[in-house]
UniProtKB/Swiss-Prot annotation:
Ranges of biased composition (kind: Basic residues): 434-445
Function: Transcription repressor that specifically binds to the 5'-TATTTT[T/G]-3' consensus sequence on promoters and repress transcription of PGC-1-alpha (PPARGC1A), thereby playing a role in regulation of neuron death.
Residues joined by cross-link Glycyl lysine isopeptide (Lys-Gly) (interchain with G-Cter in SUMO2): K283, K287
Coiled coil: 16-92
Record's compositionally biased regions (Pro residues): 168-177, 585-597
Listed name of the protein: Zinc finger protein 746
Zn finger (C2H2-type) location: 454-476, 496-518, 524-546, 552-575
Domain of life: Eukaryota
Length: 630
């Protein structure tokens, strides 16, 4: 036995035993870590439970407080109900007669009271209010009492209003305002119908007897006084003075049936109905006619006609507005109209005369101008909002003769002499460019007969305008010809000249970019590599080589590009019929691609987004998120 116990243990056995112990220790450590994690989670849940319990306790306390308040109010209501029941059961109630002011109305002579009288009245009203509240009388605090306590004067407009008689109501238990009794409503309705019939029968006879026959001819300028432009109003009655001869005052001061206002006839003029309205309605009609008279007395500039073209129809202004030929106001179009808005009455400075140099055609005296002169064409009298009459050419006029220009004899419509129908742009003789307004036409000269008369003495390049030649000479190194004081001035480009090579520039940014070539400065470094660039746009294009973003995609073959000019070059290859890249079949192209600008009828009206898409040929815009310029 001793020999067996003293036998040495082999090292392999020891190693196996140690490894087994290590594995056991590791498993125990893992269990310990898991227990620690579970303990932490349990502690966290316990803390959350405690927090929730505290919040629930706070909410419960608030609920208990609200419940206690409700119980107290319920006890008060129950006691008041018991008191009312005892009074009704014992018939121990009385009628309380209160002095004036108990219902919250202020005395009529409040402004004549002294301070001590007002203070006494305030105390009396407060005592009455407290007495009513102590007797369980459901009443709110009077508004007049609140105003008096705040030191304000009681509102007098409430006292001046008509008194509304008390109407018996049905004590319906449902919610909502009290509703008058049905029998009273029927009685009021029947009495109102009878009174209305009597007033109509009497009022029509009185009105027809005292008024002239105005149904045949509407109120026009012929029925007004000669001083149509002078507006005079009676301060007492508010009636226009010019209508004293047309409408006798005694005719409309009689009792007239109500609810019959003046009506507008189909021809655009105002007529009074036979069953006319009350005195206030007649005054309204007269004021309306005065406003129209003011419109007649004020001339309107032709450029302001389009804004007011919808007030009357094509033939409805003849009765209100005189013909300019008949009144002698048909002057040459070179004179400026005093611009005043007929509706708002806003005056603008007089427009200057035309300075285009073309002759101003005048209208012959035998040419009759149509009636709708104000809201139609200044020369021919048709409405701008509607189509011109049959046989009238908006480009030629009523006689069929176009207005000729002194430059080349081309028949055009002078935009300064008549408003432009259908939003046509102004065009100058010999030029294809159109302008939407007259100032742009003035700034754009006619095409010179020589083509390009302005030639640079340094390089021999020709230009159409002297301004273009001056800008070119600043970059070419020469001086503008024919400009007084050009040498040594600030416009000769001496301030934008490079000191290294002597080159001139028209903009400071171009000079700064040029100087970077001499100094070697590259202020835009790449954060991914060591390259630097002189322009931010080039740095953005370089970033796309790192990110792999190709925002410009060809709509024909689907190929993407980093730069926009690469896409344009690729699209030019498609347009020229070049073969596609290897492995990329080219889909069939349409024989004639539609042009939305030249053939809008083939494609229909385009939205602004469609026009932008067709114009850019599917180019996508590079935004700030993709690295584009802001």
């Amino acid at each position: 036995m001793a020999e067996a116990a003293a036998a040495p243990i082999s090292p392999w056995t020891m190693a196996a035993t140690i490894q087994a112990m290590e594995r056991k220790i590791e498993s125990q450590a893992a269990r310990l870590l898991s227990l620690e994690g579970r303990t932490g989670m349990a502690e966290k849940k316990l803390a959350d439970c405690e927090k929730t319990a505290v919040e629930f306790g706070n909410q419960l306390e608030g609920k208990w407080a609200v419940l206690g308040t409700l119980l107290q109010e319920y006890g008060l209501l129950q006691r008041r109900l018991e008191n009312v029941e005892n009074l009704l059961r014992n018939r121990n109630f009385w009628i309380l007669r209160l002095p004036p002011g108990s219902k919250g109305e202020a005395p009529k002579e409040w402004g004549k009271l002294d301070e001590w009288q007002k203070e006494l009245y305030k105390h009396v009203m407060r005592g009455n209010y407290e007495t009513l509240v102590s007797l369980d009388y459901a009443i709110s605090k009077p508004e007049v009492l609140s105003q008096i306590e705040q030191g304000k004067e009681p509102c007098s407009w409430r006292r001046a209003g008509p008194k509304v008689p008390d109407v018996p109501v049905d004590p319906s238990p449902g919610s909502g305002p009290p509703v008058p009794a049905p029998d009273l409503l029927m009685q009021i309705k029947q009495e109102g119908e009878l009174q209305l019939q009597e007033q109509q029968a009497l009022g029509v006879e009185a009105w027809a007897a005292g008024q002239p026959d105005i149904g045949e001819e509407p109120w026009g300028l012929s029925q007004l006084d000669s001083g149509a432009g002078d507006v005079s109003t009676d301060a007492a009655s508010g009636v226009h003075a010019n209508f004293s001869t047309t409408i006798p005052p005694t005719s409309w001061q009689a009792d007239l049936p109500p609810h019959h206002p003046s009506s507008a006839c189909s021809d655009g003029t105002l007529k009074l109905s036979t069953a006319a309205s009350t005195e206030a309605d007649v005054k309204i009609v007269i004021k309306t006619e005065v406003q129209e008279e003011e419109v007649v007395a004020t001339p309107v500039h032709p450029t302001d006609l389009e804004a007011h073209g919808t007030l009357f129809g094509p033939g409805q202004a003849t009765r209100f507005f005189p013909s300019p030929v008949q009144e002698g106001a048909w002057e040459s179009q070179g004179s400026s109209f005093p611009s005043q808005d007929p509706v708002l009455g806003l005056r603008e400075p007089a427009r200057p005369e035309r300075d285009l140099g073309d002759p101003t055609p005048t209208v012959p005296q035998d040419e009759t101008s149509p009636g709708d002169w104000l809201f139609g064409g200044v020369r021919w009298g048709w409405n701008f909002r509607c189509k011109p009459p049959a046989g009238l050419n908006p480009r030629t006029g009523p006689e069929g003769l176009p207005f000729s220009s002194s430059d080349n004899g081309e028949a055009v419509l002078d935009p300064g002499q008549a408003p432009r129908p259908f939003n046509d742009p102004c065009k100058y003789p010999g030029r294809t460019k159109g302008f939407g307004h007259k100032p742009g036409l003035k700034k754009h000269p006619a095409a010179p007969p020589g083509g390009r008369p302005f030639t640079c003495a340094t390089c021999g390049k020709s230009f159409q305008l002297q301004v273009s030649l001056s800008a070119h000479q600043r970059s070419c190194g020469g001086q503008p010809d024919g400009v007084p004081g050009a040498a040594g001035s600030a416009r000769d480009g001496s301030g934008l000249r490079c000191g290294e090579c002597g080159r001139c520039f028209t903009r400071p940014a171009h000079l700064i970019r040029h100087r970077m070539l001499h100094t070697g400065e590259r202020p835009f470094p790449c954060t991914e590599c060591e390259k630097r660039f002189t322009e931010r746009s080039k740095l953005i294009d370089h970033y796309r080589t790192h990110t792999g973003v190709r925002p410009f995609t060809c709509t024909v073959c689907g190929k993407s590009f980093i730069r926009k000019d690469h896409l344009r070059k690729h699209q030019r290859n498609h347009a020229a019929g070049a073969k596609p890249a290897r492995g990329q079949p080219l889909p069939p192209l349409p024989a004639v691609p539609p042009d939305p600008f030249k053939s809008p009828a083939a494609k229909g009206p385009l939205a602004p987004t469609d026009l932008v898409t067709d114009w850019t040929c599917g180019l996508s815009v590079l935004g700030p998120t993709d690295g584009g310029d802001l």
